[in-house]
Amino acid sequence: MSNIAPQVLRHASRACSRRLSLSASLVRPAYSARTVTGSGSGGRRYVSGSQRHNAQAQTTVESAVKTEQKASVPGTAVTGDALANPSAGILKQATIMDEGNRPIYLDMQATTPTDPRVLDAMLPFLTGLYGNPHSRTHAYGWETEKATEQARSHVATLIGADPKEIIFTSGATESNNMSIKGVARFFGRSGKKKHIITTQTEHKCVLDSCRHLQDEGFEVTYLPVQSNGLIKIEDLEAAIRPETALVSIMTVNNEIGVIQPMKEIGALCRSKKVFFHTDAAQAVGKIPVDVNEWNVDLMSISGHKLYGPKGIGACYVRRRPRVRIDPLITGGGQERGLRSGTLAPPLVVGFGEACRLAKEEMEYDSKRISALSQRLLTSLLALEHTTLNGDPNRHYPGCVNVSFAYVEGESLLMALKDIALSSGSACTSASLEPSYVLRALGNSDESAHSSIRFGIGRFTTESEIDYVIKAVKERVTFLRELSPLWELVQEGVDLNTIEWSQH
């Protein structure tokens, strides 16, 4: 970390404290009338009636603070405006912290950076607009309720749903648990619907939810996938039976990026009168999603996977035909009784704004990410013994999973310490076991261990991709030269014919 960063942070803290104390002393008429005015960020704030004559003094304070900040941090690329205004300064955050020493970020499947425009939308609800959105007897509650309902509408519009079908949760993990356990327990009480179908390549929270239900007496069928990561519709149709309550199949896989045939799956489930749930955390905001066209009954969405804040997500629950679920969290009956607890307006508003931006900019983002992905993939596959994991056609371009034969994935990650990458799901990254997703594709342990996932997103640049290509080629070549297996391969030896002795 840069040695100037502590100085910057201490000074910014002092400046902020000084500004707040001066504001408090300048504007403190007791019991003065309040009016609602517009704010520069598009939100609303309460101001006292006597604040008008203090406006000039407040402007002077702001100007003095910025001037002092500029003078106190010479040599940085951060302006006083950026330090005083968090929304302006977020794009310079890396400069403040490390002066350019942070790795290139290519782990977009783990999380995405918060879009600065999302932060702009959130800021008023972290300060002046602090009402409980469920308090309907005064203006503080009304204004936050209006904002949360607008956010709900943005989420619904993104997936072609009705706003009343959107239930806010803490994220996709909760939404997956809520959907799978909720439907299974509601319809399993009769004892007639105690069968669930999912795939072997689902996210860990889906697989764990199914295992918990198995402990409760439910039967679960784990469908295999083909070598390209896609299921066979024939296998799904054969697995459905009269006691099947739910089919849960993710839209875009978080490790290999394959896109399952959602229309065909949804049509089959609807014809068999079986509820269809999909974990769409890696799809919503990145590819076109329509719950009605796909005949989806339940869908899990995550805010931080589409440039929104962490800790917020949504569960789409269809109203017609109605889907009945047992809630996981009970209490005050918020969110139509399906998810009790007070909503966090800053997170909800940020999530809604992220969805609005995703809808508005999806076509542009998609074309740009596709071009960067093709540039990366073409160069990487030019290396010997390098393969793309997953179907090359039914594939989200922002997720590129490549196996580099005769190179240990963990060694390559360490060699690429200037690039933030992953060898698989962030939820299983602490495990040294080979990826269960790649194993389900039929990959060997060696192939699974040699895989690296490249995540490309909205803020990835062409120069970053070019740097990554150069670095990967150099370091893969270097690591292979250290491997005795690579030497044998170069000599034309078939490693499968070697009988290895054990000591």
Curated annotation (Swiss-Prot):
The keyword Mitochondrion applies. It is found in: Mitochondrion. The modification N6-(pyridoxal phosphate)lysine is found at residue 305. Keywords: Iron, Iron-sulfur, Metal-binding, Mitochondrion, Pyridoxal phosphate, Transferase, Transit peptide, tRNA processing. The active site is at 427 (cysteine persulfide intermediate). Pyridoxal 5'-phosphate binds at residues 172-173, 254, 282, 302-304, 342. Its EC number is 2.8.1.7. [2Fe-2S] cluster binds at residue 427. One of its GO terms (molecular function) is metal ion binding. It holds the Pfam family Aminotran_5. Residues 34-50 have a biased composition (Low complexity). InterPro entries: Aminotrans_V_dom, Aminotrans_V_PyrdxlP_BS, Cys_deSase_IscS, PyrdxlP-dep_Trfase, PyrdxlP-dep_Trfase_major, PyrdxlP-dep_Trfase_small. Its cofactor is pyridoxal 5'-phosphate. It catalyses: (sulfur carrier)-H + L-cysteine = (sulfur carrier)-SH + L-alanine. PANTHER family: CYSTEINE DESULFURASE, CYSTEINE DESULFURYLASE FAMILY MEMBER. Belongs to the class-V pyridoxal-phosphate-dependent aminotransferase family. NifS/IscS subfamily. This is Cysteine desulfurase, mitochondrial. It comes from Arthroderma benhamiae (strain ATCC MYA-4681 / CBS 112371) (Trichophyton mentagrophytes).
